[in-house]
Every structure is written in C-alpha cells, then in structure tokens.
C-alpha cells in the first residue's frame, strides 16, 4: 500500500508540472523569448538625431582638414568640438568610441579649451619644400649629368665602330683572289658536257645539211633523206 501511494504522488507531481509548463506557454507570448537579455543603458537614437550628428561631425572634420601640419591646437579644437557640440545630439552612441582614441593625442590639452589657443599661420611642410628647392635643382642637375653620361657612352661605342671600319677596308676583299674548290667527279662531268656541246656545234658548222650531223643519225627521217639523195646522185 505504501508503494502504491508513493507512485500516485509522483504521477500527480508530474501532471502538475506539465500543466504549469502548458499554462506558461499559453500566457507568455512567443516573441518574449527573443527579447534582448542585456538592454542598452543609453537611450536609443532616432533617425533625425543621427542625421544631425553626421552633419555636425562632417562640418567639424572639414575644419580639421584646414589645420596646418603638426598644429595640435587646431586638431584638438576640432576633436573637442565634436565631443562637445555633436555627441550631445545622440548621447551614449557607440560611435563615440573612435573619438576617444583620437582624443588620446589631446590628453595634455584635456583641461584646456584648444580652440582658445593660437593656431599656426604657416605650414611647416611648405617651408620645408621651399627650403628644399636647391636640393630639387641638384636632383635635376644629377639627372642631366646622367643623360650626358649616357650620351658619352653612346659616342664612345660609335667611335669604336668607326675605328674597326677604318682598319677593315673593302679594297682588301676586291684585290684578294677567290679560289673555288670543286669535286673531281663534278669537274669530269662538266668537261664531258662541254666536249659534247663543242662537237655538236662544229658538226653543224661544217655541213649545211642537217642530214650530215652525227647527232641526228639516229633519226629515221634523216636516214631516208640520205638514201634519196644517194639514189638521185646515182641516176645522174
């Protein structure tokens, strides 16, 4: 009996827990589970506030661009103005974090209004450039010297070529006899060809008749001509 009572108590507890979970799901809306567990400590900026903040920062950053080089007072004046005049439009905005990094350079002027300090009227970089004009001229002179050096090199090479041409004259090649070396078999073939051509030409010149040429004896027409001429001489 005691065990049965124990089991019944456990079942009732389980049913009770399930009913509590079901009621919690019905009462609590679903989007409640997506709420931010760590809400922001600063008020949310509206869209108009962000537009004002952006225009204010752009205006002061433009003044920062007009500062002379190494003018700490001018630069810190612009940064302090952004921190003082712009970020009150949207307090606690996370974008102020980058400004804290920039203001580290102005730490020595943190208790002073940098805008009340005198700004530089001349730019040190421009002065350095003006002082550096002789150096620029010397650089130009160095370039001109390099060009002259290159030209002298070209003239030297040209002179060397002229000297070589003066030593080598074309008359040496014109007066020099050139010997052609021909193989013995080729010379024998050339001589036979020249002898055959000479025999043919001499035979043509000795006899006005084509029938008496030795090179034409193999032709049957010429043989018939010779027979006819022989019979004609025999008849007379």
From Swiss-Prot:
A lipid is attached at residue 208 (GPI-anchor amidated glycine). Glycans are attached at residues 192, 195, 198. Its main location: membrane. It is found in: Cell membrane. One of its GO terms (cellular component) is plasma membrane. Residues 209-236 form a propeptide. It comes from the Eukaryota. This is Predicted GPI-anchored protein 43. The gene is PGA43.
């Amino acid at each position: 009996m005691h065990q049965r009572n124990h089991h019944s108590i456990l079942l009732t507890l389980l049913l009770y827990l399930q009913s509590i979970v079901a009621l919690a799901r019905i009462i609590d809306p679903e989007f409640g589970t997506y709420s931010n567990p760590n809400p922001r400590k600063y008020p949310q900026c509206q869209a108009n506030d962000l537009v004002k903040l952006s225009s204010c920062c752009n205006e002061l950053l433009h003044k920062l661009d007009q500062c002379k080089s190494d003018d700490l007072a001018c630069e810190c004046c612009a940064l302090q103005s952004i921190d003082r005049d712009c970020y009150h439009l949207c307090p606690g905005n996370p974008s102020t974090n980058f400004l804290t990094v920039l203001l580290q350079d102005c730490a020595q002027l943190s208790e002073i209004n940098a805008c009340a300090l005198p700004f530089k009227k001349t730019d040190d970089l421009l002065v350095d450039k003006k002082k550096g004009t002789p150096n620029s001229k010397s650089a130009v002179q160095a370039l001109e010297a390099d060009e002259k050096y290159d030209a002298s090199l070209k003239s030297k090479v040209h002179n060397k070529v002229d000297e070589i041409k003066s030593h080598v004259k074309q008359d040496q090649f014109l007066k020099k006899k050139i010997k052609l070396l021909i193989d013995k078999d080729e010379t024998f073939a050339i001589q036979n060809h020249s002898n055959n051509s000479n025999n043919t030409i001499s035979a043509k010149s000795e006899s006005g008749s084509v029938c008496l040429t030795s090179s034409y004896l193999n032709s049957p027409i010429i043989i018939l001509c010779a027979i006819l001429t022989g019979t004609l001489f025999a008849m007379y």
